[in-house]
Regions:
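Conserved Rossmann-like nucleotide-cofactor binding loop
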Residues: 96
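Nucleotide/phosphate-binding catalytic cleft detector across ATP-hydrolyzing
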Residues: 1-93, 101-209
Length: 209
């Protein structure tokens, strides 16, 4: 996570080393021909951010670099036929950004990208636990709560999970039982932001799609 902030590179040198490692794992460290590599970026990155991704990938040993917007890659990965003349909506919730796009005829018709995604959900859960239970938890614990109990629906059947953390008053280790209803409350603001982004894209989509 220290390599990327809001879906773009924040540490060029370490990112380059990471990509070089992946190239080595994929095609070996002693390749004779530089590989062609496709890299996904958020749909609303700037030209400067896009060039940084391309430069880091080439510095890591790539011959050709193809930059693909994340919604297009997500659609292809989901098996959607993006070449059809009808619209397909993709909501790609990543770590740093959520991309919402309507795709048709092989390209993005309308899209938006917001800096609310997995990391923001984790941060919201950490804040909720501090405010409502006076307990400090780490990012990994917050992510586990998100994955196991996280929900965007208020009427989801309730489930519970016991988590460990540090008591903010005594400073001692403690554990507490957390419910899915609490996670709904903790995540609701982030969910609302994503829903608003979806509505925005729908409003901008041409009626014929």
């Amino acid at each position: 996570r220290v390599l990327f902030r809001s879906g773009v590179i924040s540490n060029f040198e370490v990112t380059e080393r990471m990509i070089r490692y992946f190239i080595g794992k994929s095609v070996g460290f002693h390749w004779f021909k530089k590989p062609r590599i496709a890299v996904c970026v958020p749909s609303k990155v700037t030209d400067v951010e896009r060039r940084a991704v391309e430069q880091a990938t080439k510095s890591a040993g790539a011959g050709q670099v193809f930059i693909i917007e994340e919604p297009v890659a997500a659609a292809l990965g989901a098996g959607l036929d993006i070449s059809r003349p009808c619209g397909s909506m993709v909501v790609d919730i990543g770590g740093g950004t959520t991309d919402v796009a309507v795709i048709s005829l092989g390209g993005i018709v309308v899209s938006t990208s917001i800096k609310v995604a997995g990391d923001k959900f984790d941060d919201a859960i950490v804040r909720y636990m501090r405010k409502n239970h006076r307990i400090n938890i780490g990012e990994r614990t917050a992510e586990n709560l998100k994955v196991i109990l996280g929900t965007a629906c208020a009427d989801t059947p309730e489930s519970k999970l016991t988590v460990k953390g540090g008591d903010m008053v005594s400073g001692l280790p403690t554990e507490i039982e957390v419910s899915s209803k609490e996670m709904y409350k903790a995540m609701s603001e982030c969910v609302t932001a994503i829903v608003d982004a979806i509505f925005y894209v729908l409003e901008q989509t041409p009626p014929e799609l």
